[in-house]
């Protein structure tokens, strides 16, 4: 009898030990995958094979980020020194879009720049190493941007140009797209956005999708779309936006919106990264930002732009001053600490500086 009970005890012990190393099958089931690729139209660049597995597969890098044993899945309040799952390549200073194209992570915004001032500003930016230029129909400077790019001597494929359709163009988007192509005169448009929601925005976006198929536009996206608007809009279109461009700065941080957009495999870009609309001086003079800037031997503007990059937000500050344009490119020889990121996070006022 004792021999039988001893055998039973050994058997029970073996069963218990066999289950000790097993992890719950759904341990990571609820984790946000900010690099998860989305369903996308067929792309023409070979880089897409590395960034997405046939557009609906699982991104290998996302798998690596999401299966670390015991990893805390909650996004830190202020982000780490480089944001968790940051999609940016800080070596090449680019990000791979879900459309299969690479885009620079810093550039020049051209709002309020017109005529010769715009041409000179874009030229100064290109001479300073900038390869991302943002324009729009409503900026009335697409011709000037195109002129500067054409006359730069830089190969067209090395410069990434973004323009936008305004809501008053949504009723005839095909004509608006042709108008942008004619004004820029750059053979193709790297990215076209809808400037903000409006009547006919879905039809306008579908027209941009057709232009992608025709090779006139390479990537499409949205500007001034937030969570509620995206939840309504996305089910009605075929191509997931490659980018969403919103107002983002330390006083308006969109800490709930950014992770949502990134979780869809969409890149986030911030306009007015330095405040804008009369608020720039106030933001650059902020005591916390000034202290951090002094600690790194940098300007307040450089600290704010670096903060955006470490949050995974592409920056397009605007300027007509060649010195400031150059300064705004010098963002890659320092790094903010997690504590510094937290201090800037705490400056959030949820304060928009424009009506969009």
Summary of predicted features, one role per range:
Residues 1-8:
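Bacterial N-terminal signal peptides that target proteins for export
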Residues 21-44:
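Short, low-complexity, disordered segments immediately C-terminal to signal peptides
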Residues 197-356:
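Beta/alpha (TIM)-barrel catalytic core signal, keyed to glycine-rich beta->alpha loops juxtaposed to Asp/Glu
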Residues 174-194, 210-214:
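CE4/NodB-like, metal-dependent polysaccharide N-deacetylase domain
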Residues 114-126, 170-184, 230:
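Short, acidic/polar
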Residues 22-28, 52, 67, 72-78, ...:
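Terminal-tail/helix-coil boundary detector
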Residues 60, 74-159, 274-275:
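N-terminal binding-site loop/beta-alpha segment at the start of enzyme catalytic domains
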Residues 16-19:
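C-terminal motif of bacterial Sec signal peptides marking the signal peptidase cleavage site
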């Amino acid at each position: 009898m004792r021999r039988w009970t001893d055998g039973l005890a050994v058997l029970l012990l073996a069963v218990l030990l066999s289950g000790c190393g097993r992890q719950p099958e759904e341990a990571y089931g609820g984790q946000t995958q900010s690099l998860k690729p989305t369903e996308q139209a067929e792309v023409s660049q070979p880089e897409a094979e590395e960034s997405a597995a046939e557009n609906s597969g699982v991104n290998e890098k996302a798998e690596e980020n999401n299966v670390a044993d015991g990893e805390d899945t909650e996004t830190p309040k202020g982000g780490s020194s480089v944001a968790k799952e940051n999609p940016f390549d800080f070596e090449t200073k680019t990000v791979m879009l879900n459309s299969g194209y690479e885009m620079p992570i810093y550039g020049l915004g051209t709002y309020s720049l017109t005529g010769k001032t715009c041409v000179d500003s874009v030229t100064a930016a290109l001479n300073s190493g900038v390869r991302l230029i943002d324009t729009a129909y409503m900026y009335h400077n697409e011709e000037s941007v195109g002129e500067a790019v054409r006359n730069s001597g830089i190969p067209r494929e090395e410069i990434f140009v973004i323009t936008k359709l305004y809501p008053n163009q949504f009723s005839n988007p095909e004509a608006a797209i042709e108008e942008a192509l004619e004004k820029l005169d750059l053979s193709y448009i790297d990215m076209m956005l809808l400037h903000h929601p409006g009547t006919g925005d879905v039809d306008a976006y579908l027209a941009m999708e057709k232009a992608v198929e025709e090779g006139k536009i390479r990537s499409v996206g949205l500007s001034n779309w937030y969570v509620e608007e995206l939840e309504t809009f996305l089910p009605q279109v075929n191509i997931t936006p490659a980018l969403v461009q919103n107002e983002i700065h330390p006083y308006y941080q969109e800490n709930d919106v950014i992770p949502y957009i990134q979780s869809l495999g969409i890149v986030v870009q911030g306009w007015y990264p330095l405040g804008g609309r009369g608020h720039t001086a106030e933001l650059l003079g902020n005591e916390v930002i000034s202290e951090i800037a002094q600690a790194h031997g940098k300007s307040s503007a450089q600290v704010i732009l670096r903060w955006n990059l470490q949050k995974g937000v592409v920056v397009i500050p605007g300027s007509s001053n060649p010195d400031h344009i150059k300064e705004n490119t010098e963002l890659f020889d320092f790094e903010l600490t997690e504590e510094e990121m937290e201090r800037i996070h705490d400056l959030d006022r949820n304060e928009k500086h424009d009506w969009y």
